[in-house]
């Protein structure tokens, strides 16, 4: 199997590339150890990555939440436009590759409880960009251009090295910094709760999501209730 991984030099991407070592993996990023170096924000580069030989695209490259909020134009280019360029490359390649997308729970609002019925309501540009990409992936899948699936990630921790610009970066820092002998002033209240996941489980989830057949995952479809049921559900029956 020939696999393309964008964001291959990142925290999640590099771990995913290692886990896929049994396959032929083409990793791309702006820095080593990615095999193909380039900026996915440039349309020509993004569209050159998908060839008819690619079986699966893992699209992990993104500008994280804080960065996308600070620089709307760059966030739109990296998170939204580059994703559409990759989708177009898949469409033009003409062989319906799998397209596994790293989405985010940032598509939701700040509610405490989230389940499968929770409606998306992003509060940041990053979440809005991820949600738009999900809709595009649904449509490209519906039309038979790709076999798309998306994973809405919570905070992945503990991220090594220096902090990135993610809004939730403090969650790794409160563990990482003391372990390296550095003080850290936590910017949130002591009773703050957030969804977290380990790197190993994220990598496993991506691989399992890729292996699932499309008919098991199923399309994202709204349920339309007959108009006659609306008054009944609101007012009851006699």
Spans of model-derived segments:
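Conserved Rossmann-fold NAD(P)-dependent oxidoreductase catalytic core, especially the SDR/UDP-sugar
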Residues: 84-124
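Active-site Tyr-X1-5-Lys
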Residues: 110, 121-149, 180
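Rossmann-fold cofactor-recognition segment
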Residues: 30-43
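NAD(P)-dependent short-chain dehydrogenase/reductase
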Residues: 138-193, 199-207
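Glycine-rich NAD(P)-binding loop of the Rossmann-fold in SDR/ketoreductase-type enzymes
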Residues: 70, 74-85, 120, 124, ...
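N-terminal Rossmann NAD(P)H-binding glycine-rich loop of SDR-like oxidoreductase domains
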Residues: 3-22
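NAD(P)H-binding glycine-rich loop region in Rossmannoid oxidoreductase-like domains
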Residues: 40-78
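Mid/C-terminal beta-alpha module of Rossmann-like enzyme folds, strongest
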Residues: 208-238
């Amino acid at each position: 199997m020939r696999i393309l991984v964008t964001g291959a030099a990142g925290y999640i991407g590099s771990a995913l590339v290692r886990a896929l070592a049994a396959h032929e993996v083409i990793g791309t990023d702006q820095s080593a150890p990615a095999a193909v170096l380039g900026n996915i924000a440039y349309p020509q580069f993004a569209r050159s990555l998908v060839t008819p030989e690619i079986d699966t695209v893992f699209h992990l490259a993104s500008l994280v939440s804080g960065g996308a909020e600070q620089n709307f134009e760059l966030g739109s280019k990296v998170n939204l436009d580059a994703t559409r360029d990759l989708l177009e490359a898949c469409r033009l390649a003409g062989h319906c590759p799998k397209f596994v997308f790293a989405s985010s729970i940032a598509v939701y609002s700040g509610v405490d409880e989230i389940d499968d019925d929770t409606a998306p309501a992003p509060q940041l540009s990053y979440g809005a960009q991820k949600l738009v990409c999900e809709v595009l992936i649904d449509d490209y899948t519906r039309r038979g251009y790709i076999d798309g699936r998306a994973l809405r990630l919570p905070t992945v921790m503990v991220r090594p090295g220096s902090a990135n610009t993610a809004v939730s970066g403090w969650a790794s820092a409160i563990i990482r910094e003391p372990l390296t002998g550095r003080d850290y002033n936590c910017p949130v209240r002591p009773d703050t709760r957030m969804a977290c996941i380990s790197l190993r489980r994220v990598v496993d989830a991506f691989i399992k999501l890729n292996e699932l057949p499309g008919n098991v995952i199923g399309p994202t479809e709204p349920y339309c209730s007959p108009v006659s049921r609306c008054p009944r559900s609101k007012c009851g029956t006699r």
